[in-house]
Design a protein with these regions (language model features):
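Core catalytic lobe of class I
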Residues: 1-152, 156-161
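Short, conserved SAM-binding/catalytic segment
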Residues: 164-178
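Acidic, PIN/NYN-like endoribonuclease modules and their adjacent C-terminal/linker elements
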Residues: 181
Length: 181
């Protein structure tokens, strides 16, 4: 039996205000995730390619062409998701800036600046951003910097502890700025 899509209460009814889900994944995971998403009513998608000017495969550089891309999907229901592009064209191939500022907490940690850009495009101030695989907490830090409500989940205690510390430091900096600013 085919699973019926879950109806989300309070889901946006206006054009351009619907939520979306962004998933980072390996290239070969995309079709599986698209099919899985359809079971839950996320019938539409846009492929994303994140282009790096560096590669983790540096030791293989003399043996073969090395990968410098990460992949992702924007998943959404039937209405186009909220899209705040300020009249600028947004391509599905996005530059991945190297993050030399943030402490490396997690092996697949995403750059805060990249996450901020995605959050700015698909949310407004005060919106909720959820990261079900929070890892380093960089998505929550990015959301916090943009005045969004961030919620993250992490099952590994070592990552949770470090991520939580980073998020709390970020919130403290924000409080200090508000208090003295």
């Amino acid at each position: 039996a085919e699973k019926k899509p879950v109806k989300v209460e309070g889901e946006a009814r206006q054009k351009g205000d619907a939520p979306c889900m962004i998933i980072f994944c390996a290239f070969d995971q995309q079709m599986y995730l698209i099919e899985l998403a359809k079971r839950y009513g996320l019938n539409n998608y846009i492929n994303l390619v994140f282009r790096k000017n560096f590669s983790a495969q540096v030791l293989k550089a003399n043996m073969k062409v090395v990968g410098n891309c990460e992949y992702g999907l924007i998943l959404y229901r039937d209405r186009l998701p909220k899209f705040r592009n300020n009249g600028k064209m947004i391509f599905n191939c996005i530059d991945w800036p190297r993050d030399n500022e943030s402490e490396k907490i997690h092996p697949t940690q995403k750059p805060v600046e990249l996450l901020k850009r995605l959050i700015e495009i698909f949310t407004d101030e005060g919106d909720v951003v959820i990261d079900p695989c929070a890892g380093s907490g960089s998505t929550i830090v990015a959301a916090e910097r943009l005045n969004r409500k961030g919620f993250g989940f992490e099952i590994k205690k070592e990552f949770y502890t470090k991520a939580n510390q980073w998020i709390m430091e970020e919130k403290q900096v924000k409080l200090d700025v508000k208090q003295f600013g």
